[in-house]
Amino acid sequence: MKELDLHGISHYDVKDVVENFILMNDTPFRIITGYSERMRNLTKNILDKHKFKHHTSAHNAGEIIITN
């Protein structure tokens, strides 16, 4: 499963990084947001905007699984 790790990416840059990744890759994939609530919310908002189905990993709250 492809993976995007957002550790080290600023909140300012997350929109461009996540959009590039989700539009260039086939699902399923995962995005590692870490435990920053702001980073998780920014990422989920982008996924919702593009109508991707997603859920938080049952094993890691800092990981979003995209299944669309």
Language-model-detected regions and their locations in the chain:
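Long, charged, low-complexity intrinsically disordered regions
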Residues: 1-68
